[in-house]
Amino acid sequence: MSTDAAQWQLVIPMSGFGERFRAAGYTVPKPLIPVEGKPIIEHIIGMYPGIKNVLFICNQDHLDEPRYRMREILDSICPTARVAGIAPHKLGPVYAVSRAYDMLDENAPTIVNYCDFSCVWDWDAFRRFAAETNCDGVVMCYTGFHPHMLHSTNYAYVRTENKNKVLQIQEKQPFTDAPMHEFASSGAYYFCNARLMREAFEETRQREDLRLKGEYYVSLAYRPLLEKGKDIRVFEIDKFRQWGTPADLGEYQCHMRYKVAEAAGFSAPRQKGTLLLPLAGMGSRFAKENYTLPKPLIPVNGRPMVLQAWRALPRADENRFVLRRDMPGAEALVAMLRREVRARELSSSTLPQTARPGPACWGWMA
């Protein structure tokens, strides 16, 4: 199999209505919503440098609406791409792709990519992985903490053997009570060729057990392949950005605004008096999500949560942190605060006082 990106084909079904975005006040179809200065669909094409054979499968109503300029925008993003317009439907991405089978090279390696996310990953390494394993399909996945997973597990999840070979895949629910420790599908799906993809899609459309609330999802098209003993793998991506709902997109944009402000340096004027941070909660909701650290110590962008909160607040002459005596890891938390905040004095009913240069910092057990 060729690893030359020019020999591969990328299929992007983007014919959905985007009703949640429309209800939230967005005035263009979801793939055209701007994120960081360019439409979502441009971010997706940017994931595949060097690819030429691209097929956009669009809602014909969107193509016909002059305000959207959809065809013009797609042509400018990927001049070598083809655009297929299909009738509006609510049958899901598998159905959308099925309307354009005849536009695909049945022998070419094929990726079906949803139109509402982006990621940081190694595209070259992925093509080598597909060639070296000679597998039949790959689900591009992420794992670990991602903010959107705190309020929803409405994604496709994969159960694997040795974190590589897919054993099971299911939509809209994780396999365990610890979804952040599972592989979740990014929304990008590889098939060794379009002929195999078509066979899987057609069998999926014939099976009611693979239809979810009236829609056919690409993830579930791997079920027939797994049942036939096909070799389906997982390829882990580095960083994932979910924009599938207005809440997902808003959360991402808020996070990025914070990152920009953090990089520029927080500039609130120094305050006289005392900065008081209560850390007395036990973090029960995080514990239910299988976090093992006390909430103040959970890493956020590489630093404990309490330090990120402290860094974002105005500097003060004194810093006081209030901890519960029975909080698991309380002593480790106090030691970290001593070290990181460079406390001049830290006292509690159970821990000795220590003097260090820098702003005054006291901690005690409530």
Regions found by a protein language model. Name each.
Residues 115-118:
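The conserved acidic donor/metal-binding loop of glycosyltransferases
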Residues 120-208, 331:
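Conserved core of the sugar-phosphate nucleotidyltransferase
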Residues 32, 158-160, 234, 297:
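A structural signal for short hydrophobic beta-strand segments in well-ordered beta-sheet cores
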Residues 25, 170-173, 201, 253-256, ...:
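Short, flexible helix/strand-to-coil boundary loops that buttress conserved ligand/catalytic motifs
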Residues 2-10, 106, 182-275:
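Conserved alpha/beta core of the MobA/IspD/sugar-nucleotide pyrophosphorylase nucleotidyltransferase superfamily
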Residues 2-15, 20-22, 26, 34, ...:
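Conserved N-terminal catalytic core of the sugar/cofactor nucleotidyltransferase
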Residues 162-173, 258-265, 269-270, 366:
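ER/Golgi luminal nucleotide-sugar-dependent glycosyltransferases, focusing on the catalytic module
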Residues 26-31, 291-296:
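Short alpha-helical oligomerization interface
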